């Protein structure tokens, strides 16, 4: 009887250690905090990369970051495999929601500043985000919740 309990307990420990806390991600995808990530080397425009991500898995999109630790994880994922400095991330249209007006209260109806692009890339060596022309092609990272 004692041997049966010991074996049962041993099997329970093995089962719990195998189930772990890692996300159930498809092969070739990496897990972090309940999400799955995959870096893709091919170059695409922002829109094409986003579309490609949505076709890879239900709920998949270009990667979003919600902590510096998550961004660091993506850097460790992209740097060795992509060997590229810039990758598309899921942030877009950051200036579209802004409302500009002059200090005298009049509306902004004339602009003469350098273009601010609407799509963002992440510099893989230091997590710096840069605005880029959405039509430029870069590698990219997809993410979905496991």
From Swiss-Prot:
SMART domains: CLECT (SM00034)
Tissue expression from the record: Expressed by the venom gland.
One Gene Ontology term, aspect cellular component: extracellular region
Signal peptide: 1-23
Keywords linked to the UniProt accession: Disulfide bond, Hemostasis impairing toxin, Platelet aggregation activating toxin, Secreted, Signal, Toxin
Chief place of localization: secreted
A Pfam family this chain is assigned to: Lectin_C
A single MF term (Gene Ontology): toxin activity
InterPro entries per the UniProt record, alphabetical: C-type_lectin-like (IPR001304), C-type_lectin-like/link_sf (IPR016186), C-type_lectin/snaclec_domain (IPR050111), C-type_lectin_CS (IPR018378), CTDL_fold (IPR016187)
TM segment ranges: none
Limits of the C-type lectin domain: 32-143
Keyword presence, Disulfide bond: yes
Cysteine-cysteine disulfides: 25-36, 53-142, 119-134
Top-rank lineage group of the source organism: Eukaryota
PROSITE patterns found in the cross-reference section: C_TYPE_LECTIN_1, C_TYPE_LECTIN_2
Subcellular location: Secreted
Function statement: Agglucetin specifically causes platelet aggregation and surface exposure of integrin alpha-IIb/beta-3 with a GPIb-(GP1BA-) dependent manner in washed platelets. It binds to human platelets in a saturable manner, and its binding is specifically blocked by anti-GP Ib mAb. It regulates endothelial cell survival and promotes angiogenesis by activating integrin alpha-v/beta-3 signaling through FAK/phosphatidylinositol 3-kinase (PI3K)/Akt pathway.
Family indicated by similarity: Belongs to the snaclec family.
Subunit structure: Heterotetramer of the subunits alpha-1, alpha-2, beta-1 and beta-2; disulfide-linked.
Protein name: Snaclec agglucetin subunit beta-1
């Amino acid at each position: 009887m004692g041997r049966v309990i010991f074996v049962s307990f041993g099997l329970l420990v093995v089962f719990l250690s195998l189930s772990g806390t890692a996300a159930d991600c498809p092969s070739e995808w990496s897990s972090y905090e309940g999400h799955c990530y995959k870096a893709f080397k091919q170059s695409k425009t922002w829109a094409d990369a986003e579309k490609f991500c949505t076709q890879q898995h239900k709920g998949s999109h270009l990667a979003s970051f919600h902590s510096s630790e998550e961004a660091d994880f993506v850097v460790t994922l992209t740097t060795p495999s992509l060997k590229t400095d810039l990758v598309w991330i899921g942030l877009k249209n950051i200036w579209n929601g802004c409302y500009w007006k002059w200090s005298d209260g009049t509306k902004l109806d004339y602009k003469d500043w350098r273009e601010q692009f609407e799509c963002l890339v992440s510099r893989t060596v230091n997590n710096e985000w840069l605005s880029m022309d959405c039509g430029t092609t870069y590698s990219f990272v997809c993410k979905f919740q496991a």
